[in-house]
Regions:
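N-terminal membrane-anchoring/stem segments of glycan-assembly enzymes
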Residues: 1-35
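Cell-envelope/extracellular polymer assembly enzymes that use nucleotide-activated donors
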Residues: 37-40, 68
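Acidic helix N-cap motif at the loop->helix transition within catalytic regions
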Residues: 50-54, 78-86, 132-134
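Short, acidic, metal-binding catalytic loop of nucleotide-sugar glycosyltransferases
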Residues: 57-66
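A conserved acidic beta->alpha catalytic loop
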Residues: 65, 73-82, 96
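Short aromatic/hydrophobic "clamp" motif used to bind/position activated sugar donors
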Residues: 108, 120
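The conserved acidic donor/metal-binding loop of glycosyltransferases
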Residues: 124-128
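Conserved donor NDP-sugar-binding/catalytic core segment of glycosyltransferases
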Residues: 132-146
Length: 146
């Protein structure tokens, strides 16, 4: 037998062996898309008693309800801290500001540390989201990542 014949037989045997092994492999489970991510909405607030109720009402009317809404009260001198529990959301009293931090970013850091969601949404207290805001945000996140 010549060298090209041996090469052809070797390739044929390997090809057949590959198909045999491929057919013996277990099938992959059917793909099922992951569910909706759990969404935590974090709201830093300092003296937002006039605007916070509208935002909390808009969040209660979302077509996709968040796992949790956390208001981080950044040392307000008005009724901000009292408004949020009445709406059924969690309120965190901001801890003293560490050196090198700014108030809003420190408040958001504290909220992020306490949140339980996979997707964190940061909103200012004067935001007025549409009823489909969170649903669109999550859909875009699932489609494009983030």
């Amino acid at each position: 037998m010549s060298s090209p014949d041996l090469l052809a037989i070797s390739l044929l045997v390997r090809w057949l062996l590959g198909w045999f092994l491929c057919l013996r492999m277990p099938a992959l489970p059917e793909f099922t898309p992951m569910g909706q991510p759990r969404v935590s909405v974090l709201i830093p607030a300092r003296n937002e008693a006039l605007t916070l109720p509208q935002l909390l009402a808009a969040l209660a009317d979302q077509s996709l309800q968040p796992l949790e809404v956390i208001v981080i009260d950044d040392h307000s001198s008005d009724d901000t801290a009292a408004i949020a529990p009445a709406a059924g959301v969690t309120v965190l009293a901001s801890e003293p500001l560490p050196q090198g931090w700014c108030g809003k970013t420190w408040a958001l850091q504290q909220g992020a540390n306490r949140s339980q969601g996979e997707l964190l949404v940061f909103l200012d207290a004067d935001t007025e989201p549409s009823p489909t805001f969170l649903a669109h945000l999550v859909a875009n996140h699932q489609q494009y990542g983030g």
